[in-house]
From Swiss-Prot:
Pfam families: Thiolase_C, Thiolase_N. The gene is fadA. It comes from Acinetobacter baumannii (strain AYE). This is 3-ketoacyl-CoA thiolase. It is an enzyme of class 2 (transferase). It is found in: Cytoplasm. One of its GO terms (molecular function) is acetyl-CoA C-acyltransferase activity.
Length: 390
């Protein structure tokens, strides 16, 4: 178990919503800010502390327009009933946004710029399309290929560079669904999912506490029958081996070790190190490799010390390429044990805090000590966080 210093950054708790389908899903009548506010209220209710002490609410969100616009972080705090004295901000590092929220809060805690932070992220991809309102500079094509904006093509590129076969991708995708459904049936998500009111297919109100995107019937035969979707003629990436479009939110409570101790709150983990890194936009999915290497060096660890891993499965080709790059290809029994984004979906701004929360729960379930959460980021970045249970 880790020994804590006063300014160490500890994770007190983490929660998430169930993941809803973006097309006519269970959250089709629920706004992104309302969904997020439910999680903030739940986080406060689960942990006894004075909310007046919260320095800032930091929320990750990628497409900050429509219901996700006008500093959704501040709006979430107000909707959740936090005191008006609690500040709120929204951060955007594309797919890594809510992990960046963790890093931003952690840096402030470590430098004594606040003791208690609520962080999280959200993306309602059913209400706010991924490309809604986007106007890219034509000059950018001088610096990276236009095709680098098409995530599926970057996955195809990684697959070819790293010799990832169609068969490997299909098997990886099926296994993601199998693990996620097994985790659901065995109650392994219960500690992290907060039930939020939504609607079933017939329009009746229901409590949404089971991930809607998982396919319990996922099988190799069905996956093999699908045609490549991004490179129809010579590709290998299909809809089934890509992360699903989904709607969801996540939230975490971070504190300084000394404040958590003073409040009598038992930390679940301490943040050992953090890192971001850039890479070529054409292989954006490889970003977790340099980011993880940086984070491990800062923690004084090697990949062999990592006992549990959560990696954002943007695509099977991407995930498998990262595992090869990190030397984890033959250690998939420690990676995404409760399934990944192929089964759960990847609501962009939500995913960073979601996978970190899931990592924490898996570490507790497996009784492991040191874990890694890492993600690729569009336009060529990676982000990584190393945590240790306390």
């Amino acid at each position: 178990m880790a020994t804590l210093n006063p300014r160490d950054v500890v994770i007190v708790d983490g929660v998430r919503s169930a993941m809803g389908k973006s097309k006519n899903g269970m959250f089709r009548n629920v706004r992104a800010d309302s969904l997020s506010a439910e999680l903030v209220r739940a986080l406060v209710a689960r942990n006894q502390f004075d909310v007046n002490e919260v320095e800032d609410l930091i929320w990750g969100c990628v497409n900050q327009t429509l219901e996700q616009g006008m500093n959704i972080g501040r709006n979430i705090g107000l909707l959740a009933g936090l005191p008006k004295t609690v500040a709120g901000q929204t951060v955007n590092r594309l797919c890594g946004s809510s992990m960046q929220a963790i890093h931003t809060a952690a840096a402030q805690i470590a430098t004594n710029q606040g003791d208690i932070f609520i962080i999280g992220g959200v993306e309602h991809m059913g209400h706010v399309g991924m490309m809604h309102g986007i106007d890219l500079n034509p000059e950018a094509s001088k610096h990276y290929a236009k095709a680098s904006n098409m995530m599926g093509l970057t996955a195809e590129m990684l697959g070819r560079m790293n010799g990832i076969t169609r068969e490997e991708q299909d098997a990886f995708g099926v296994e993601s669904h199998r693990r996620a459904w097994a985790a659901t049936q065995e109650g392994r998500f219960k500690n992290e999912i907060i039930g939020v009111e939504g609607h079933d297919a017939n329009g009746f109100k229901i409590l949404c506490d089971i991930d809607e995107v998982i396919r319990p019937d996922a099988n190799l035969e069905a996956f093999k029958a699908l045609k490549p979707v991004f490179d129809p003629k010579g590709g290998s990436v299909t809809a089934a081996t890509s992360s699903a479009l989904s709607d969801g939110a996540s939230a975490m409570l971070l504190m300084s070790a000394e404040r958590a101790q003073a409040l009598g709150l038992k930390p679940r983990a301490v943040i050992r190190s953090m890192a971001v890194a850039g890479c070529d936009a054409a292989i954006m999915g490889y970003g977790p490799v340099p980011a993880t290497q940086k984070a491990l060096k800062r923690a004084g660890l090697s990949i062999a010390d990592i006992q549990t891993v959560e990696l954002n499965e943007a695509f099977a080709a991407q995930g498998l390429s990262v595992l090869k790059g990190l030397g984890l290809y033959d250690k998939q029994d420690i990676v995404n044990l409760n399934g990944g984004a192929i089964a759960l979906g990847h609501p962009l701004g939500c995913s960073g805090a979601r996978i970190t929360t899931t990592l924490l729960n898996v570490m507790e379930q497996q009784d492991t000590q040191i874990g890694l959460a890492t993600m690729c980021i569009g336009l060529g970045q990676g982000i990584a966080t190393v945590i240790e249970r306390v």
